């Protein structure tokens, strides 16, 4: 214990700014990622001499190093925190379900553009603003923008088939351009105001609205003045969620990350205020190298040693170094142009800086992934269960439904090399009482292990079921009836608070009940597999439920197959709008004749 982390010494030099902190153990393994409005104040709570919760005390006992990243505000800290948790899955963090990508605000092209949420590749014509730290934050921003400027958010298929204003117009969230209740010039002004805000020009926008408010007051239009006052207040509330766009000038953003075993420098190129792209570099450095040392070496080799390479007028870095003044002087003389290297930045540049840090963290994590944390967890599980050797194959089952609707069971498979996604299976559960998880589990296990009799499938070493004694008893019964050779049964029951780290485990006949420490690698493996089974089950359930709810009277119409049905619903914006359409309106849809339109109309109005 002589090498215990010196919290007091660390806090003496810790920033009081907002940011993200990362706690690592003596092996350099990430234990916990957190965010704070005041880093020093938040971190001081971990190093009190008394009053720590047991789980917190266990965490602090393992800390060998704490790393911090200063951010411009709490929103930026949240973005970075989520990125790191997503990539590292630290054992002391609550592991939220992973989103595949951060959402963007999308503004479409056209005479009456729409605002919406976008994920994935940017293939649609229009403008993108973001990324945002969460779907919740982007929905809040869109809701406030909708309230302030009333730009439509409906899909184009819905928009072009309206014959009267929708509910959004009635509650003053849309000016109903679909039915001509707003002039194109007025709508364009609302779009322009929305873009100003999304570009980060909220101060200029607020000044413009303030001037309009004063003019309204002078003309005694107090109702309009009050509306403008409320718009300004709304804008101030969401200034922290502005997009990456809206910067100016040419900038290279460099973020270096150094960890045991390697380093990464992530470069983001910004030209004319727009992010053009990014790239990772992995210099060979020693473990003792500091971030500033890595950055100084990179600047010299990347720019100074390559005079033909484009050099912007500004370089943003995530650490400082004593060699920077000399590098600036040398590059200025070499390129005959002014150069600034900045460490402390704000607003959009701070956003670029934090995103570069997050990307460097992710890239380095992938670079060092062959250390195979998962293999070590399998070893720990073997020790916890007193096995002679680590298991080679683990399967986990979970059930998902909505009040008994569209029940789906999942089976995920893991080996020492990780998830074996090619062997995942889903089972649509039929013929059981709605909401009966035991019957659903019985059916899924029977279908899975019944295949073994036919020589199909592999026998797992460990079968995990998400549930307590009841689910474990069902699994035992099924395996007994099918004469499945001996395998280890492990039930995972959440604690009373349903928080990770408080699970109760049941082994085989459920007589052996035990728990594992919250920092146990064996427990982390069990949680990881269970959470993956839950994710796989719930995505399957949602897909099945959505398909069932989309079925309609259209299925009874000859000549309207699945493809044409999808195209019809897309064209009209949903079944409800299609049902309201006349025969002539239906016939305007691509591929629909007058005769077929008559049949569709009759089917939809047969009652």
UniProtKB/Swiss-Prot annotation:
Q: Name one Pfam family in it.
A: HHH_5
Q: Which UniProt keywords apply?
A: Cytoplasm, DNA damage, DNA excision, DNA repair, Excision nuclease, SOS response
Where is this gene product found?
A: Cytoplasm
Q: Does the keyword Cytoplasm apply?
A: yes
Q: Which InterPro entries match?
A: GIY-YIG_endonuc, GIY-YIG_endonuc_sf, GIY-YIG_UvrC_Cho, Hlx-hairpin-Hlx_DNA-bd_motif, RuvA_2-like, UVR_dom, UVR_dom_sf, UvrABC_protein_C
Sorted alphabetically, the Gene Ontology cellular component annotations on this record are: cytoplasm; excinuclease repair complex
Q: Name one GO biological process term.
A: nucleotide-excision repair
Q: Does the keyword S-adenosyl-L-methionine apply?
A: no
Question: Care to name a GO molecular-function term for this sequence?
Answer: DNA binding
Task: Give all residue intervals belonging to the GIY-YIG domain.
Answer: 16-94
Name the SUPFAM superfamilies on file.
C-terminal UvrC-binding domain of UvrB, GIY-YIG endonuclease, RuvA domain 2-like
Tell me the ranges covered by the UVR domain, including all copies. 203-238
Family (UniProt) = Belongs to the UvrC family.
What does the annotation say about its assembly with partners? Interacts with UvrB in an incision complex.
Its annotated function is as follows: The UvrABC repair system catalyzes the recognition and processing of DNA lesions. UvrC both incises the 5' and 3' sides of the lesion. The N-terminal half is responsible for the 3' incision and the C-terminal half is responsible for the 5' incision.
Q: What is this protein called?
A: UvrABC system protein C
């Amino acid at each position: 214990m002589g090498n215990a982390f010196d919290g007091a010494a660390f806090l003496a030099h810790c920033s009081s700014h907002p940011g993200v902190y990362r706690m690592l153990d003596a092996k350099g393994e990430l234990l916990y990622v957190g965010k704070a409005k005041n880093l020093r104040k938040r971190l001081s709570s971990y190093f009190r001499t008394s009053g720590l919760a047991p789980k917190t005390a266990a965490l602090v006992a393992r800390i060998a190093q704490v790393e911090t990243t200063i951010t411009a505000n709490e929103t930026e800290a949240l973005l970075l925190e989520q990125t790191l948790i997503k990539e590292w899955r630290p054992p002391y963090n609550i592991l939220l379900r992973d989103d595949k990508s951060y959402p963007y605000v999308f503004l479409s092209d056209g005479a009456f553009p729409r605002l919406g949420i976008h994920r994935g590749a940017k293939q649609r014509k229009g403008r993108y603003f973001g990324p945002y730290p969460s779907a919740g934050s982007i929905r809040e921003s869109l809701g406030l923008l909708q309230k302030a400027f009333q730009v439509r958010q409906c899909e184009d298929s819905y928009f072009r088939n309206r014959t009267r204003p929708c509910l959004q117009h009635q509650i003053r969230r849309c000016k109903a351009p679909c039915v001509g209740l707003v002039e194109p010039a007025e709508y364009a002004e609302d779009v322009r105001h929305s873009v100003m805000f999304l570009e980060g020009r909220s101060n200029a926008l607020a000044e413009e609205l303030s001037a309009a408010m004063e003019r309204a007051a002078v003309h005694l239009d107090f109702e309009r003045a009050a509306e403008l006052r409320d718009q300004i207040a709304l804008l101030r509330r969401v200034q922290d969620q502005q997009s990456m766009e809206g910067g100016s000038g040419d900038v290279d953003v460099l973020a270096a990350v150094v960890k045991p075993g390697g380093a990464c420098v992530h470069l983001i190129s910004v030209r004319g205020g727009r992010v053009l792209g990014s790239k990772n570099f992995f210099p060979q450095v020693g473990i003792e190298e500091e971030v500033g040392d890595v950055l100084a070496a990179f600047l010299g080799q990347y720019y100074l040693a390559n005079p033909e390479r484009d050099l912007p007028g500004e370089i943003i870095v995530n650490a400082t170094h004593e060699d920077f003044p000399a590098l600036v002087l040398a590059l200025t003389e070499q390129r005959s142009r002014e150069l600034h290297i900045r460490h402390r930045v704000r607003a959009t540049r701070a956003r670029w800086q934090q995103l570069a840090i997050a990307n460097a963290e992710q890239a380095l994590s992938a670079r060092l992934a062959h250390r195979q944390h998962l293999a070590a967890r399998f070893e720990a599980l073997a020790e916890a269960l007193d096995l002679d050797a680590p298991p080679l194959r683990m399967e986990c089952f979970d059930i998902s439904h909505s009040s008994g609707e569209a029940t789906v069971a999942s089976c995920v498979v893991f080996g020492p090399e990780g998830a074996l996604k090619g062997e995942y299976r889903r089972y649509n559960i039929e013929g059981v009482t709605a909401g009966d998880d035991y019957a659903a589990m019985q059916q899924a296990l029977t279908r899975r292990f019944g295949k073994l009799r036919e020589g199909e499938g592999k026998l797992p070493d460990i079968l995990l079921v998400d549930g307590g004694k009841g689910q474990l008893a069902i699994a035992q019964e099924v395996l007994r009836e099918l004469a499945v050779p001996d395998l280890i049964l492990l039930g995972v029951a959440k604690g009373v608070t349903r928080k990770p780290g408080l699970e109760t485990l049941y082994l085989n006949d459920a007589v052996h009940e035990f728990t594992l420490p919250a920092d146990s690698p064996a427990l982390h493996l069990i949680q990881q597999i269970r959470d993956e089974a839950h994710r796989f089950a719930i995505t399957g359930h949602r897909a099945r439920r959505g398909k069932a709810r989309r079925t309609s009277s259209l299925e009874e119409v000859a000549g309207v197959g699945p493809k044409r049905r999808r195209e019809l619903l897309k064209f009209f914006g949903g079944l409800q709008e299609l049902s309201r359409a006349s025969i002539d309106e239906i016939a305007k849809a691509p591929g629909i004749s007058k005769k077929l339109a008559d049949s569709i109309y009759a089917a939809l109005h047969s009652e």
